């Protein structure tokens, strides 16, 4: 798989790094670790929203060399939960994120996949937290999906599963898997270790802004690594063919 993004000695004050790594096309990479590990700081840096020490190459060019307009064409970024910036119909908010605004069938498909069919006419300031999260997810998917944006390369998601129920999480997993199969690189933070063990291709385990381990999910999410990150003991079990992590006292 080709390298989409290369990080070299990336650091920000005392919150992050220095750390290095690469993001590959067609893979799902999870950032895991305790609160304050630096996951959100790292995602914002990878999105080009902040600057600091070290270097990031995106599609072979320095990240800081990308204009905001060009960057929005090649990568999409979901930050942590935000309140709606202003009131507008959901369909209008989603349309603003589409590069090809004639693709109404794609908008309807993505909205349907996230159970937003009956919310398209509702104002964004009348949504519950979970509904707004799904609208924001639909927006970044519409922005970056290769179906309508052949230039799309990278999707960055900060705790995308927040406020989603089990069925909605499953629906999002299907969407992300489909995007991955179309060649998109996906990087997301997660607090659900078992979800990472099932759905990620690779993982970066962070603590205190440092990278404790990186590599294949099963090689990173080991009881010794997790004990070092979280300060508690873990066991990894195989239950009916599924691997599962549990904490132990």
Curated annotation (Swiss-Prot):
The keyword NAD is annotated on this UniProt entry: no
One Pfam family of this chain: ABC_tran
PROSITE patterns noted in UniProt: ABC_TRANSPORTER_1 (PS00211), ABC_TRANSPORTER_2 (PS50893)
Domain of life: Bacteria
TM regions (residue ranges): none
Binding, ATP: 33-40
Keywords in alphabetical order: ATP-binding, Cell inner membrane, Cell membrane, Membrane, Nucleotide-binding, Translocase, Transport
Protein name per UniProt: Vitamin B12 import ATP-binding protein BtuD
Stored InterPro entries: AAA+_ATPase, ABC_transporter-like_ATP-bd, ABC_transporter-like_CS, ABC_transptr_BtuD, Metal_Ion_Import_ABC, P-loop_NTPase
Protein location: Cell inner membrane
MF terms (GO), sorted A to Z: ABC-type vitamin B12 transporter activity; ATP binding; ATP hydrolysis activity
């Amino acid at each position: 798989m080709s390298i989409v993004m290369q990080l070299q000695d990336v650091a920000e004050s005392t919150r992050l790094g220095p750390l290095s790594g690469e993001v590959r096309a067609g893979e799902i990479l999870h950032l895991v670790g305790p609160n304050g590990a630096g996951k959100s700081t790292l995602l914002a840096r990878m999105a080009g929203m902040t600057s600091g020490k070290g270097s990031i190459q995106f599609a072979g060019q320095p990240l800081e060399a990308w204009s905001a307009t060009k960057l929005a064409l090649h990568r999409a970024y979901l930050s942590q939960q935000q309140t709606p910036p202003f009131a507008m119909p959901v369909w209008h908010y989603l349309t603003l994120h589409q590069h090809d605004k004639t693709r109404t069938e794609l908008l309807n498909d993505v909205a349907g996949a996230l159970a937003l069919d009956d919310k398209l006419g509702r104002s964004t300031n009348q949504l519950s937290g979970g509904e707004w999260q799904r609208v924001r997810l639909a927006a970044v998917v519409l922005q970056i999906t290769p179906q309508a944006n052949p230039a799309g390369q990278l999707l960055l998601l900060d705790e995308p599963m927040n406020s989603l129920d089990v069925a909605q999480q499953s629906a999002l997993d299907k969407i992300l898997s489909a995007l991955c199969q179309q060649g998109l690189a996906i990087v997301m933070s997660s607090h659900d270790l078992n979800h990472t063990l099932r759905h990620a291709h690779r993982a970066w385990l962070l603590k205190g802004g440092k990278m404790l381990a990186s590599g294949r999910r099963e090689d990173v999410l080991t009881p010794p690594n997790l004990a070092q990150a979280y300060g508690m003991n873990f066991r990894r079990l195989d239950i009916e063919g599924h691997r599962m992590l549990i904490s132990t006292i």
